Amino acid sequence: LYILTHHEFSESEAIQLWEKIRKRQQEMQQQLNRHVSFRVAMLDYFISSNIFKNPTIIDIHLFERLQFQATYDELTQVFNRRFILYILKKELERAKRHKHDLTIVLFDIDNFKRINDVMGHLTGDKVLKLFTNVVKDNIRIEDSFGRLGGEEFLLVLPETPISKAFPLLERIRDILAEISGEKMFFTFSSGIAGFPQHADEEITLLHSADKALLRAKLEGKNRDYIFYKE
């Protein structure tokens, strides 16, 4: 941001600005009824907000690279851990404010270590990319999907009751079974938790989904479980 605007932002200011730009991106997409890149939304916001007092011309490829590194996981090109957790925090705040449902799904690719050990890391990378591509192709524009690390991923479904997650997970599983083939066949397990049923803080919500995921793994894998209080 400093490179573009010659203005130093604190971490809290930068986060607030990022949220405003993301909101502008969503508004532009709704108005135009098509995808609008984050870069376009950022420039539109900067210009309309008069943040560009002394704008600097920089190489567009450098700008895109910096933007990508701050937001996305390089291998899978979904949101990175920091950004998907930030989105979860903001979506949970919005759900509380407007009294909406919020569902999260914590994914883990089954037997991923064995895939890496037996078939090699290149195949492991292909599995991660295939999985993320299928998920991205089957979620809504308002949903957010990111990689927490390794073979673990988080899906945030705003304004969505838990029951609506199951048809989506079934569709993802069916598509993967159809296209992965015998040489690269793999499955996933998931843990599901929701607001307001299970938690009203992001850490507790994640912990609830993680418990449900562990239960799915222990009871045979390749299945989806909702968190329940014992």
Model region roles, listed by residue range:
Residues 130-201, 213-215, 226:
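GGDEF/GGEEF active-site signature
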Residues 68-86, 107-120, 129:
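Conserved nucleotide-binding and Mg2+-coordinating catalytic segments in signaling enzymes
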Residues 116-124, 149-150, 220-222:
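A short glycine-centered flexible hinge/capping loop motif at secondary-structure junctions
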Residues 1-65, 230:
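Regulatory sensory/coupling modules that transmit signals to nucleotide-handling catalytic cores
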Residues 84, 88-89, 105, 127-128, ...:
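Heptad-repeat coiled-coil signal-transmission/dimerization helices
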Residues 87-119, 135, 146:
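Active-site-proximal structural segments of metal-dependent nucleotidyl cyclase/transferase enzymes
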Residues 38-75, 82-94, 143-144, 156:
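Signal-transducing coiled-coil linker helices
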Residues 208-230:
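Catalytic/regulatory signature loops of cyclic-dinucleotide turnover enzymes
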